[in-house]
A protein has these predicted regions:
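Secreted/periplasmic proteins
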Residues: 2-7, 12-170, 174, 178-211
Length: 211
């Protein structure tokens, strides 16, 4: 009987291997710490509420005060000069053409492709989990005209600061022009009023959830 019990436990361990915890990026951890939730996260317990912008309910034994003014609903490029058009590349996520829809997100504090998952902004060379995930990008005040594009690469945005880097986005030439830049924006080389996020706000498209 003892032999049978040991055999059963061994078989069970093989059949049900240990589940590894998700290693999150610098940006995911930054927003989780700042807001108590992350927009479009896969887990209902950590995803910001798409209806009212509040962190998920934590239970009566864990009261937390959250200032709604600091809770960023989606990410905006307003008052930055970083929503520029990308060039062709091989990149972190592979080869791509700037003539296809797509976007580039912050590589993190290492400022290079990187070989350390702990320093990935939204992605880097060692942490590619967010590659290919679909974002939506729209002009401020134009919720009727979103564009859905994949993450194609990582960009430094010349910043090592999570408070700056995590909200930045660069665009393929195709998406840049799809967003109808003004004459001034074409002259300056960047768009100044974008709103974007991973396309899983309601939790129904988990394949696009950021990590």
């Amino acid at each position: 009987m003892r032999f049978v019990t040991v055999l059963f436990l061994t078989t069970a361990l093989v059949a049900f291997p240990a589940v590894k915890a998700t290693v999150h990026t610098e940006c995911f951890n930054y927003f989780m710490k700042k807001d108590g939730c992350v927009w479009s996260a896969a887990d209902d317990r950590t995803r910001c509420n798409a209806t009212n912008g509040k962190p998920p309910f934590q239970g009566v034994e864990r009261f937390q005060h959250h200032n709604q003014k600091t809770l960023q609903r989606r990410y905006t490029s307003e008052d930055t000069n970083t929503s520029f058009a990308m060039r062709d590349g091989p990149g972190i996520c592979g080869n791509y053409s700037t003539n296809q829809p797509g976007a580039c997100l912050w590589v993190g504090s290492e400022q290079v492709y990187g070989n350390d998952t702990a320093t990935a902004g939204w992605l880097n060379g060692a942490k590619t989990s967010n590659c290919g995930k679909q974002l939506y990008v729209q002009r401020k005040g134009r919720p009727d005209k979103p564009f859905y594009v994949p993450v194609l690469d990582g960009c430094s945005f010349y910043s090592k600061n999570v408070t700056v880097g995590c909200t930045q986005i660069a665009l393929s030439n195709k998406t840049f022009y799809d967003l109808e830049p003004t004459a001034q924006e074409l002259k300056q080389g960047y768009l100044g009023d974008l709103i974007w996020d991973f396309n899983n706000e309601a939790g129904t498209k988990g394949q696009n959830a950021p990590v």
